[in-house]
Amino acid sequence: MIKILADDRIPFVSELFGDFGELILKPGAHIQNRDLLAVNALLTRSITSVDSALLEGTAVEFVGSATAGFDHIDSTWLKKQSIHWAYAPGANATAVAEYVLHCVAYLHKKNLLPRKSATAAIIGVGHVGCVVSDRLRKIGFTVFHNDPPRAQLEKDFISVPLASLANVDLVCLHTPLVKTGNFPTYHLIDNRFLKMLKPGSVLLNAGRGAVIDNNALLQCDHVITCLDVWENEPTVNLQLLEKTTIATPHIAGYSKQAKLRATLMIYDAFLKYFHLSDTRRFSELQQLQETMTLNIQDGRNAEDILLTLFDPGRESQRMRETLAENPDQFEYLRRHFPLRNEFSAIQLTPTPSALLRKELDDWGFK
């Protein structure tokens, strides 16, 4: 019998993994080495550091992380110990891209971003960056890409140098955090880059906090800042928080569908590793995810609908007020943040007019 220990915040973990052996649920922040001594499979999230301190001397042979990144996993050590591991790359790509669209809608409403002839730069064009690029193009942006590692691997990929991005209206960061090698991203956005940006440009980071030198950003007064990730989080620089136009607690990828997608990806890896057969069909799981019905009032446009679903301005104010009162509440805000529905799971009533339908299609509603 397989013994499985899982983070209790992984959606549908009991429904998917409960039939394959003994399943133990525990908060990810409290998982310790002694919990894993007789455990064969560990299912976790980014809140748990997976390294020698956690796994040395345990029976763990498979690690599945229901996350799009693996900064919290010491993959080198796991490989040396012949411990198989899997994660969920791209699971949250749609959710992050739609977070960016919510921010764009909010910035449009505040007249902080042009609606016509707007330009955007995507720095880091992987799973998430590709989707963000596609969605921005569909609402009229001219999009430039910066991803030197990808350009080195793909001869047809065009990576625009950072120095050529001075005049774009929107800069979106979607790189992993890399501190070594030929293409480090730690403090990629530094004082020099920030000074280069034109006044009134928007800098949006929904990737990794330390890709931006937050101290340099604190001294930058000519750029509109939208941050979902923060250097040194869960500790947030409160002065920087006050300067941001949009501030959220690392929740850009928080959608119901993204969470389910991530669970299914590690579920598939688990089945493959242990040579097991699927006991659930994806269609059955989809039925567990209820769609959301939104009533469209007269006169609403697509941006109004986006901001009804998720208003970055309102959430930013809530974060500022909460952390001003208690700076240690970042993880609490993140843990208890309500999951959004992706646009594909939203039903609009009554049926939109042909004009609104076209507008909604451009923004990604189907």
From Swiss-Prot:
<feature type="binding site">
    <location>
        <position position="253"/>
    </location>
    <ligand>
        <name>NAD(+)</name>
    </ligand>
</feature>
<dbReference type="InterPro" id="IPR024531">
    <property type="entry name" value="Erythronate-4-P_DHase_dimer"/>
</dbReference>
<comment type="similarity">
    <text>Belongs to the D-isomer specific 2-hydroxyacid dehydrogenase family. PdxB subfamily.</text>
</comment>
<dbReference type="GO" id="GO:0016618">
    <property type="term" value="F:hydroxypyruvate reductase [NAD(P)H] activity"/>
</dbReference>
<feature type="binding site">
    <location>
        <position position="175"/>
    </location>
    <ligand>
        <name>NAD(+)</name>
    </ligand>
</feature>
<feature type="binding site">
    <location>
        <position position="46"/>
    </location>
    <ligand>
        <name>substrate</name>
    </ligand>
</feature>
<dbReference type="Pfam" id="PF00389">
    <property type="entry name" value="2-Hacid_dh"/>
</dbReference>
<feature type="binding site">
    <location>
        <position position="67"/>
    </location>
    <ligand>
        <name>substrate</name>
    </ligand>
</feature>
<dbReference type="InterPro" id="IPR020921">
    <property type="entry name" value="Erythronate-4-P_DHase"/>
</dbReference>
<dbReference type="GO" id="GO:0051287">
    <property type="term" value="F:NAD binding"/>
</dbReference>
<keyword id="KW-0520">NAD</keyword>
<keyword id="KW-0664">Pyridoxine biosynthesis</keyword>
<keyword id="KW-0560">Oxidoreductase</keyword>
<dbReference type="InterPro" id="IPR006139">
    <property type="entry name" value="D-isomer_2_OHA_DH_cat_dom"/>
</dbReference>
<dbReference type="GO" id="GO:0005829">
    <property type="term" value="C:cytosol"/>
</dbReference>
<dbReference type="InterPro" id="IPR036291">
    <property type="entry name" value="NAD(P)-bd_dom_sf"/>
</dbReference>
<dbReference type="GO" id="GO:0008615">
    <property type="term" value="P:pyridoxine biosynthetic process"/>
</dbReference>
<dbReference type="InterPro" id="IPR050223">
    <property type="entry name" value="D-isomer_2-hydroxyacid_DH"/>
</dbReference>
<feature type="binding site">
    <location>
        <position position="228"/>
    </location>
    <ligand>
        <name>NAD(+)</name>
    </ligand>
</feature>
<comment type="subunit">
    <text>Homodimer.</text>
</comment>
<dbReference type="InterPro" id="IPR029753">
    <property type="entry name" value="D-isomer_DH_CS"/>
</dbReference>
<feature type="binding site">
    <location>
        <position position="254"/>
    </location>
    <ligand>
        <name>substrate</name>
    </ligand>
</feature>
<dbReference type="GO" id="GO:0033711">
    <property type="term" value="F:4-phosphoerythronate dehydrogenase activity"/>
</dbReference>
<feature type="active site" description="Proton donor">
    <location>
        <position position="250"/>
    </location>
</feature>
<dbReference type="Pfam" id="PF02826">
    <property type="entry name" value="2-Hacid_dh_C"/>
</dbReference>
<dbReference type="GO" id="GO:0030267">
    <property type="term" value="F:glyoxylate reductase (NADPH) activity"/>
</dbReference>
<feature type="binding site">
    <location>
        <position position="147"/>
    </location>
    <ligand>
        <name>NAD(+)</name>
    </ligand>
</feature>
<comment type="pathway">
    <text>Cofactor biosynthesis; pyridoxine 5'-phosphate biosynthesis; pyridoxine 5'-phosphate from D-erythrose 4-phosphate: step 2/5.</text>
</comment>
<feature type="active site">
    <location>
        <position position="208"/>
    </location>
</feature>
<dbReference type="InterPro" id="IPR006140">
    <property type="entry name" value="D-isomer_DH_NAD-bd"/>
</dbReference>
<comment type="function">
    <text>Catalyzes the oxidation of erythronate-4-phosphate to 3-hydroxy-2-oxo-4-phosphonooxybutanoate.</text>
</comment>
<dbReference type="Pfam" id="PF11890">
    <property type="entry name" value="DUF3410"/>
</dbReference>
<keyword id="KW-0963">Cytoplasm</keyword>
<feature type="active site">
    <location>
        <position position="233"/>
    </location>
</feature>
<protein>
    <recommendedName>
        <fullName>Erythronate-4-phosphate dehydrogenase</fullName>
        <ecNumber>1.1.1.290</ecNumber>
    </recommendedName>
</protein>
<dbReference type="GO" id="GO:0046983">
    <property type="term" value="F:protein dimerization activity"/>
</dbReference>
<dbReference type="InterPro" id="IPR038251">
    <property type="entry name" value="PdxB_dimer_sf"/>
</dbReference>
